[in-house]
Curated annotation (Swiss-Prot):
Keyword Transmembrane helix: no
Regions annotated as coiled coil: none
Species, as recorded: Geobacillus thermodenitrificans
UniProt keyword list: NAD, Oxidoreductase, Phosphoprotein, Tricarboxylic acid cycle
Name this protein carries in UniProt: Malate dehydrogenase
Substrates-to-products reaction catalysed: (S)-malate + NAD(+) = oxaloacetate + NADH + H(+)
Family per similarity comment: Belongs to the LDH/MDH superfamily. MDH type 3 family.
Amino acid sequence: MAMKRKKISVIGAGFTGATTAFLLAQKELGDIVLVDIPQLENPTKGKALDMLESSPVLGFDANIVGTSDYADTADSDIVVITAGIARKPGMSRDDLVTTNQKIMKQVTKEVVKYSPNCYIIVLTNPVDAMSYTVFKESGFPKNRVIGQSGVLDTARFRTFVAQELNISVKDVTGFVLGGHGDDMVPLVRYSYAGGIPLEKLIPKDRLDAIVERTRKGGGEIVNLLGNGSAYYAPAASLAEMVEAIVKDQRRILPAITYLEGEYGYEGIYLGVPTILGGNGIEKVIELELTEDEKAALAKSLESVKNVMRVLE
């Protein structure tokens, strides 16, 4: 039997979706299908062709096509969902939730129809609630529907720590628990630089400031851009997760997954440390938490639940 490349579909060809597609192609993780709505079919095809024409220069082998027809995504191994609207000025979070939930339901229906055996990674915000929506709508087992936020939040945390210590980001490890928002829980106790606990290297007030900046990391970029939100780091985070699955790397990465009793919570999607490999979420890693950390996680969970209440 002929060996075939993996097929990865990216739903939503905006800044994040297009950047994700480009990174996945550069990493040669598979052939890429970039999908958007019919009104945007030509720009989507244009972006895909532009990326493809960079392949001789950058030296990667991957086919990249743009489309508005989900039939082109048939038999995808992995589907990444970035589609959805961004929150506009004056728009309530509830409005954002209901609009994006409708989009998730439509997208999921098409994905399941054409790629019933795929793994789905969700980026659309509010990501905890949207991951839950896709999980319920797809009927897929929980290991195959994964939300991305922790890799991004941890990347921001690691960036700020590396800047503070003036060291390589490669030497900084960290973990962020909970929902993707102001109540996320960066676990400083489980964070290191070159194997040394951060608490031994950075004064508490500076560490607290880094935690606070991490929580507000998305907002900081929104404010600086003035229009739109972050897309380079979110796309890089998605690419890292896709690579872990495609190459069966069994990486320890924070991911949003469906909890069934872990950390004392049940029936909800929340960011926790996981092992991510060829079978999607292979395992949830349960860390021992202090009372303060438990309280912070409970607060984060409440924020997620408040969003979930809006779901139809």
